Every structure is written in C-alpha cells, then in structure tokens.
Amino acid sequence: MTLHSSIDRVTDRIRERSRNTRDSYLKKIARAAEDGPRRAHLSCGNQAHAYAAMDDKDDMATTRKPNIGIVTAYNDMLSAHQPYERFPDLIRRAGHAAGATVQVAGGVPAMCDGVTQGRPGMELSLFSRDVIALAAGVALSHDCFDSALYLGVCDKIVPGLVIAAATFGHVPAVFIPAGPMPSGLPNDEKSKVRQQFAAGEVGRDALMAAEMASYHSPGTCTFYGTANSNQMLMEFMGLHLPGSSFVNPNTPLREALTVAGVERAAAITRLGNDYLPAGDVLDEKAFVNGIVGLMATGGSTNLVMHLPAMARAAGVLLDIEDFHDISESVPLMARVYPNGLADVNHFHAAGGLGYMIGQLLEAGLMHQDVKTINGTGMDGYTAEPRLDGERIRWEAGSTDTLNDRILRPVSDPFARTGGLKQLDGNLGRGVIKISAVAEERHVIEAKARIFSDQEQVKTAFRAGEFTEDTIVVVRFQGPRANGMPELHSLTPTLAVLQDRGLKVALVTDGRMSGASGKVPAAIHISPEASTGGPLARVRDGDLIRLDATMGTIDCLAEDFDTRKPVAFDPASSSEGMGREMFAAFRAVAGPATEGAGVVV
C-alpha cells in the first residue's frame, strides 16, 4: 500500500529538521562499534574483574561467544516490575542455550506514580526518567556487552531506557516486557468510587476496597495509561517481539516470549551476520510509527513529552506539530479505559496490536520498511505468538476485529482523528487530548481561578467555591518549577464538577496522568510560568477561551500582554522527600514541548 501523503510529509519534515543531528549521531555510533567481542578490547586485568563472579569465566575469556548485558528495573514497589525478579535466571539459561554468556549489567530505579500520586515524591517522577537513563549508561559503560536486554515497563522507565539504548546506539537492544496483570475490578467502577469519595458520598474503607480490587496482582495496571502506552510504543517501534506486549506475567507464553527475546539478542550482535545496532532501529520512521500507534490507540499524553526526549538521544528532532499532524490523519481505532470500558487484556483478546498494525499498514498510515529486532519489517508484527511445546511459533494474526466495541478497522473507526490537538495562543503552546472528552466540551470559555498547586484546588472544592463554569489554572507546575508532577489527583474533583453540570477545564504548565480522561485539560503549556511564561500573568476572573476544535488557548483580558508576571516562590517544592537533591535538574530542564530533558 502506498504511504499516506501526510505520513510521508511529516517523516520528510522530521528528516530534514534532523539532518545534521542524525548524521552526527550515526557517525558517533559507527566510531563506537568494534570488531570482535566487546570485552576482548579490555586489558587482561579489566577482563578478570569482569569475569570474576561468573561460572562461565573461561568461556568469556577464551571464546567469541556474545555476552548479553541485562539492564533491569526490577523492584517490588511496582506491580508491573515485580515479575522481573526471576527473569535473570531465565535469561541466563536461554542465553547459554543460544551460545551466549549473560551478565546483569546493572539496575535502574523504577518509580510508581500510583504510589506517589499527589505526594511530594511525585515531584521526582519526571526527573527519574533521566536518572534511569544515567543509571543504565553507568551499567553499559563497562563496555563488555555485545547486546543488551532492557527490562522495564512503566511510565518513566521505558523512556529512560530508550534514551540509554540510543546513547549506546552501537549496542543491539531488545526490550523485554513483563505483561499486564489479569483483569480485576473494572476501571470505570473504580473511577466511580473515586468520584464518590471526592464528593463525600463513600468512606475510605469503600475506596480502599475498590482500589485493591483493581490493583491486585503482579503485572502492569490494566488501564491504558502511560505504562501500557509504552508497551504499545516498543512494539510499534520494533523493539519488542511481535505480540509480546500484553501477555500476562508468569504464564508459559510469557516465559517463551522472553526466551525468544534472548535468542534475538544473541543473534543480532556484531559477532554474527545480522548485526543490528539500536541506533539503526531508532530512526525517523520508527519514531513516526510510534506516534501513529499513540494516536490509533488513544494513548498517554505523557508520550508527547517522552518521545521527543527519546528521539533527541538518537539525533532525531520531534516537534508537537508532528504529533498534531499525524493525529489529524490517523483514526482512533481503540476504546480502552479511560477512553472506553475495556482494559488492555480485553484489547489484546479483541485482536490487539497485531490487528491494528495490519490495518494501519494496509491503509498506508505507517512505515513498513523499517528495521526491527524481529528481523522483519512491520509486516512481521501482524503475527501472533503461539506456544509450540516450549517454543514460540508465530501465526498469521486476525484480519477482523474480534470485538468492534473495543477495536475497529481503519475504515470504521471510533473517531476520524487520533484525538490529540496542538494548542497555540497568547497563553503559550501546549496540547490537549480529546479522545475521551465529550464533543460539547471541546470549547470552553469561562472565568479563570488561579492556583499554585493541586491541593489548593481540592481545598476550594471542599469549601464549595466552584459554583459556575470555571477554567482551573494550576501554574508553577513545569519542570523548572517543581519537576512537573502529574496532576491526576485532580481528575475526580474536576469530574464531579462536570457531572454537576458545570463547564470546567484545566489549564496548566504541568502534566496529567495517562489515565486521565473526560475533563478537558490543556497541558504542557510552555513557556512555563516559573520562567515568566504567560500563565504567570493570568489573574482570577480573567476570561479564558480553550478551543480544542480550532487549537487555540487564549486569555481574553484586554491588558493581558502588558502585565508583569507573578514571581515564582520555590520554597514549597525545594526540599523534603529528596527534592533538594534535584535542584540541579530543575535548574536546567528543557521545556515540556521539547521533552523536558536534562540529559538530552
């Protein structure tokens, strides 16, 4: 199928924008590549240190077997990462069977936003992405590895690992998922209880029971937030094996897919005939395919910030106009909570990513001619994995949706566009996701209420101060102010106001959770208020117009442009819960519209 003109045009624009940076990047990774095992270039003393704890040290010292490094984000705090506890032993066995040696190169931190939501620790969350990239870089700097396996799932972990994989772009990279937990209490029922609690209609016991029935076992949370958007992204970009993203943990199929991933890591090193450095996978076309997947699935707005940071590490420069233009051409094909009632397990059972990729390829809406760890183009990602004894066999995937309430073809989508809109106006530049927002709420014009943090909003709500249509402005939430915490804990509060019949919207230089849904939210507004951005000039009572249809965000006050910005007071977020250690990050973080990066 001929590539759609808009996808072709955006790809060419990215390629031209990135010409110099991508060329420099490719030259860098070419210089870093060496013939022979990576470890062979170390001195005997260096090598002895590297092999000292290994049972197969003789193989490592005397043979050309590839050595696979594991970078793991295992901990018990994240249900999504707990299954990784047993992966190193499984990977070692699989590696040895494939003629390779295996070492855990290092661990990286992994933070659960579900635990820190609305807490001071959330102000470390975004920066943890760059810490993860740095930690993975330290692990790989031993320069002993012919390929790398990256074990990570959740919000900042995958982006951080991709930044590291791109930085060490001469090293082949395979990403190994852990899979979603089995379905528990339906996400919409959990959300209803949260709103009831926010409204004072149920107590803490009812809320706790609902939360624990929803988050109940090892594996990724089942709603389609940032973690599961990451898993989609890795498959659409060719860094996962086909059909591996949404297979439940601790199952024979999950284990067999992990083994297959190890085999690919052993096969694509420079020691064989199929050398595939990570930097060759992470090109302009791969990032466009990732954005296409984000739009077709209605994925997390956090990736609008993470993808530019990931791409920059590979010399590719993305802009939010690229997201907007792709969204205008790619239809919304899935309804997964918060954009629908289904969870990711239901989505996978309905045909999942394989069906979706097949549809998008047939419509010319994604690039087929890309390099993937599977050794195929994207057509190989229409296949579904099946167990054949203890081995994986890929079979042709479904060409029809198995549940059109969850997954639809390109010809009959849930919406004509992907639902992500670029916003521009005198309040700055940002984005809004409207795939779960009712059409009558795409345009909101109302008076502003100004807040400096989300707790102030909740206090005003409890005091009964919201009695008319309101634009809730929460400013000083950008990366340089307080690390840009998610404002997801506002969702139940604003949803209650909306259910009471008020027209409400959020405008912020902060960000929302990938689980946020039905309330209009203009997010990532840049320049941020703490650097003197326009949000710092808004006053209580100003009339603001948020128009997602036209893509505009404006303060209508006549004297707006002549006002002096309110100064930011960093005292409330400069220390406590580790925040003092991240002052250097806050001082140099880039704007949200460019990835909010520290190390890229």
PLM regions: where:
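Catalytic or ion-coupling anion/metal-binding cores of large enzyme and transporter domains
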Residues: 1-76, 80, 89-108, 120-121, ...
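Glycine-/small-residue-enriched capping loops at alpha/beta junctions
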Residues: 83
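Acidic/charged coordination and interface sites in well-structured regions
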Residues: 86
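N-terminal small/polar loop signature for handling phosphorylated ligands or for N-terminal nucleophile
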Residues: 105-143
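Contiguous domain-boundary segments centered on the initiation and propagation of an alpha-helix
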Residues: 129-136, 141-148, 458-466, 471
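A short, small-residue-rich loop immediately preceding and capping a beta-strand
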Residues: 140-161, 172-176
